[in-house]
Regions:
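Glycine-rich phosphate-binding loops of nucleotide-dependent enzymes
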Residues: 2-239
Length: 239
C-alpha cells in the first residue's frame, strides 16, 4: 500500500482552556482532492492552520511524505512542496498579474524558462487578456485566480485552499470549480469551503468537522445526506 502524501496523528490544538481541535487522524493520498467542511467553530480552520504552519499543534503530528512538519513555519512548508492559498489574496496590488506570477515562478525556474511558465500559467488560469493589468484593478474572482496562478507556478505537490469560492459570483464559482478540477489532474488538494454548491462541483471525498473532531468522512453524496451532518448544520448537537 502506498504511503500517504499527508497524514495527521492525534492532532490537537488548545487555546487556554478551549480544545479547538481534538485528536484528529487524517490521511490524504497522492493526487487526492479532499474537502473539509463544518459549521463555524467546528475546528476545520484551526486544523487547516496547523497544516499550513500558521499554528503549531499542542500535541500530535503533521506528516508530509513521512516527514514530521508539525513545528515547521509556513515558509518552510512552502519549500517542501506545499502551496498555500488563504482567504485573503497575498498578491502585490501594485504589480501586474504577469509580474506577480513571474516573481513566484522565478523561485524555481531560471532564464527563458520563467517567461514560458508565466505564459502557460496565464492561459491556464484564464487571465492572458489581463496579464498586464495591475492586480489591484482586478475583480474579486480574478484576484483569486491570480493567486492560484502564483501558487501553481511554484509547482507544489500539494495545494491547500481556504474558501476559494468565498465572495464570488455564480459564474466565478463555476470557473473556479473547473480550475480546481483541472489542477487535480496533476496535484493533490485540500479545500476548506462553506459553499455547498461549489463542494458538489469539485468533491469526491469530504471530511466533516464538528466540535473540534472529525464527525464523518466519505463520498460527497453520502456525507451530505447523513442525518448527523444535517443536524450539525442546523445547529443541533450531533449524536
Amino acid at each position: 500500500m502506498a504511503a500517504p502524501l499527508l497524514q495527521t496523528r492525534d492532532l490537537s490544538m488548545r487555546f487556554g482552556g478551549v480544545q479547538a481541535v481534538r485528536d484528529v487522524n487524517f490521511t490524504l493520498a497522492e493526487g487526492e482532492l479532499r474537502c473539509l467542511i463544518g459549521p463555524n467553530g467546528a475546528g476545520k480552520s484551526t486544523f487547516f492552520k496547523m497544516l499550513t504552519g500558521q499554528l503549531q499543534p499542542s500535541q500530535g503530528q503533521v506528516l508530509f511524505r513521512g516527514h514530521d512538519i508539525s513545528n515547521a513555519h509556513a515558509h518552510q512548508i512552502a519549500r517542501l512542496g506545499i502551496g498555500i492559498k488563504t482567504q485573503v489574496p497575498s498578491v502585490f496590488d501594485g504589480l501586474s498579474v504577469r509580474e506577480n506570477i513571474w516573481l513566484a515562478a522565478g523561485r524555481i525556474h531560471s532564464g527563458k524558462r520563467v517567461d514560458g511558465v508565466v505564459d502557460e500559467m496565464l492561459e491556464r488560469i484564464g487571465l492572458t487578456g489581463a496579464a498586464n493589468r495591475l492586480v489591484g484593478q482586478l475583480a474579486h474572482g480574478q484576484r483569486q485566480w491570480a493567486e492560484l496562478g502564483i501558487v501553481l507556478s511554484t509547482d507544489p505537490e500539494l495545494i491547500l485552499l481556504d474558501e476559494p469560492a468565498a465572495g464570488m459570483t455564480h459564474e466565478e464559482v463555476y470557473k473556479t470549480a473547473e480550475l480546481v478540477r483541472e489542477i487535480n489532474r496533476s496535484k493533490a488538494l485540500i479545500v476548506v469551503e462553506h459553499d455547498m454548491q461549489f463542494i458538489r462541483m469539485i468533491a469526491r471525498t469530504v471530511t466533516v468537522f464538528s466540535q473540534g473532531a472529525v464527525l464523518v468522512e466519505g463520498s460527497v453524496d453520502t456525507v451530505l445526506s447523513d442525518q448527523r451532518v444535517k443536524d450539525v448544520y442546523l445547529g443541533r448537537r450531533a449524536a
